């Protein structure tokens, strides 16, 4: 994750993949295997609450200070900032749950840390069915944060916390609410 730092990098990866059909190309989107995400996917696949209306996701890191001088703070090595580090997992889950998005409106900022990578990203996405998704990926959250809300025609899911080695994102939870 991600498949490359630039479009040219990604094209090279695709070329190699085509030349080597005997190999499997995989990316590190490990969030798909967390218990709350697997249960949410099951609810969606079983159509328990009808169509998805929208998503709202926040994925933030508490500080980037340890990254001063680190490769993650340098675009030439990292390809980008907080979106490619953490936010890409949220985008993957949006797509894992409802497919590709066709429209994107976004803003990026490096207002606080002033690195050559972004420290905050806000984006709104829409797919061909009109499902919308909103993401805020932040390196100025001041506390690790993970929250994904999914609103359906007949219910609501909230995934919060994320099992990690540091346990800094809190206890992983899935709240399931049926429309009253």
Roles of regions detected by a PLM:
Residues 85, 92-166:
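Contiguous beta-strand/loop segments that form the cofactor/metal-binding neighborhood of enzyme cores
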Residues 1-32, 47:
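Beta-strand-loop-alpha-helix segment that lines the small-molecule cofactor/substrate pocket
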Residues 23, 31-114:
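Predominantly a Rossmann-like dinucleotide-binding segment in NAD(P)-dependent oxidoreductases
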Residues 15-19, 42-46, 71-74, 121-123, ...:
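Short, hinge-like loop/turn segments at secondary-structure boundaries
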Residues 7, 14, 41, 92-95, ...:
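A cross-family signal for key residues in well-ordered alpha-helices
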Residues 160-180:
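C-terminal active-site/capping subdomain that shapes the small-molecule cofactor and substrate pocket
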Residues 55, 71, 104, 123, ...:
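Well-ordered beta-strand positions enriched in small/hydrophobic/aromatic, beta-favoring residues
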